[in-house]
Regions:
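Intrinsically disordered, low-complexity linker/loop segments enriched in Gly/Pro
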Residues: 123, 143-145
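Charged, gly/pro-rich active-site loop segments
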Residues: 110-112, 120-133
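Helix-start/capping segments and mature chain N-termini
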Residues: 1-120, 148-361
Length: 361
């Protein structure tokens, strides 16, 4: 189906960042956003591109009280020929469908989603950065804004997309990769079996902020979550999936518990490693096994994967107050190769022999 969304241009364009090497993450927002409404009996309607600006919301809107919402995260990349492309949007669409089903949010057709992304990117195409390590972060989200205190699915929703030119999530001084410190604790959990861990919903992240604040006390950037049942098996790192290279095996937590977000970068990492002949296992891994591997020298690398950072190498863990160093604390070869390959594919500087990129403009 072909969609033609009306565009209302801003009359007060913002100054674009002067130095693309200092964008940071989500510090700037573009001139426009996409908005679309849903009403029960009518479906999705009135999609439009409008100026990015504050909007009114009724204080009794159900999202403010019962958190019926979802979001996605993706990036648009400037290619060497000046075009703009995105990475594996089919995976975002599938994950969005799973989240919507879990949260009782109406289905959003995949072709509509892609058309909306293209429309808002086209409106702000001059904002897409081109400096190394940069991209346009795309944040689609849906929330129920029916005015009601009833604990029931809303009958009215808004679908919106906002854009933010962004740099590297964890960048070294030269703009390349650097290692981070990660905190491991067994007091709080991210998700439990039967919950919303596999869905991309705000509550999963809001509920993790207490542990993230505790991590800062140990000079750590983020939290490595353990499982809810036994508090011993590694799951995710903050907003990312976690990988551990022990001896000749790369290990990541399995998805069958329903507590792990099925990351698009995670799937890409697994496929690339298998293509390169690296042994990859999706299995349970205890934090005790990780610590033991560090002591006997078999722990080669730990890294996180996600849309924001692509690949984020981990140099140290703080495990319940005790520091555990990963090899020599520097970026490992597998993490570096994965980053170079994935970011190269995303920006068009490395041939995409996997068919993962999607040209927008």
């Amino acid at each position: 189906m072909e969609y033609n969304f009306p565009v209302t241009r801003t009359t007060h364009p913002k100054p674009r960042p002067a130095d693309e090497t200092k964008l940071g993450f989500a510090k700037y927002f573009t001139d426009h956003m996409f908005v679309m409404d849903y009403d029960e009996g009518q479906g999705w309607h009135d999609g439009r591109v409008v100026p990015h600006e504050p909007f009114l919301i009724e204080p009794a809107s159900c999202v403010l009280h019962y958190a019926q919402m979802m979001f996605e995260g993706m990036k648009a990349y400037r290619t060497p020929d000046g075009g703009v492309q995105i990475f594996r949007p089919d995976m975002n669409i599938k994950r969005m469908a799973r989240t919507n089903e879990r949260m009782c949010i109406p289905e959003l057709p995949g072709d509509l989603f892609l058309a909306a992304v293209k429309a808002v990117i086209e409106a702000d195409r001059d904002w897409v950065p081109s400096a190394p390590g940069t991209a346009m972060y795309i944040r689609p989200f849906i929330f129920g804004d029916e005015v009601s205190f009833s604990v029931l699915p809303a009958k009215h929703y808004k679908f919106m997309i906002i854009l933010s030119p962004t740099g590297s999530y964890y960048a070294a001084n030269d703009g390349g990769l650097s290692t981070t410190r990660i905190y491991v604790q067994d007091k709080y959990i991210r998700a439990a079996h039967g919950g919303t861990g596999y869905a991309k919903v705000g509550g999963n992240y809001g509920g993790g902020m207490r542990a993230s604040q505790d991590a800062m006390k140990y000079n750590c950037k983020d939290v490595l979550w353990l499982d809810a049942a036994e508090h011993k098996y590694v799951e995710e790192i903050g907003t990312s999936n976690a990988f551990f290279r022990i001896a000749d095996e790369v290990i990541t937590a399995p998805l069958d518990s329903g507590t792990i977000l099925p990351g698009i970068t995670r799937d890409s990492v697994i496929q690339l490693l298998k293509k390169w002949g690296v042994k990859v296992s999706e299995r349970k891994l205890s934090i005790d096994e990780v610590v033991a591997a560090s002591k006997d020298g078999s722990l080669q690398e730990i890294f996180a994967s996600g849309t924001a950072a692509v690949i984020s190498p981990i140099g140290w863990l703080n495990v319940m107050g005790t520091d555990v160093q990963v090899e020599d604390g520097t970026v490992g070869p597998v993490a570096q190769k994965l980053y170079d390959t994935l970011y190269g594919m995303q920006t068009g500087t490395v041939a995409d022999d996997m068919g993962w990129t999607y040209r927008l403009l």
